[in-house]
Amino acid sequence: MSDDLQGHRQEIDRIDDQILRLLNERSKSVIEIGKLKKQRDAEAHLHTPAREAAIFERLSKQNTGPFPTDAIRAVYREIMSASLSLEGPQKVAYLGPRATFTHMACMQKFGSSAQYLPSRRRLCVVAAILR
């Protein structure tokens, strides 16, 4: 393996280590924010779509490439999904069985860390969330 290739791989490893450290640092802040929200209002909604949208918008505008903006959104969808799960289980009910369009749409919106609850009828979707 060439020295150039090895050097680039070592640089990627170093960057990956930084990303991991920063993700854990971000997670600690998320946990603290969750505690503050619960102190202010025990019934507080942990998921704040407006805040998510603002983050996506800010990062999209900041991106100068070459990493694709659509990929940034997908990466941050998973970061936010995992972050929300640190604050408590995120239940998402959807109509139909697993791997249907509704299930896939929910996964695209809420990420892979949410707890997905399939339902056969629309009324069951509401009941599943309330459980």
Predicted regions and their residues:
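Domain-level signature for soluble enzymes in the chorismate/prephenate branch of the shikimate pathway
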Residues: 1-131
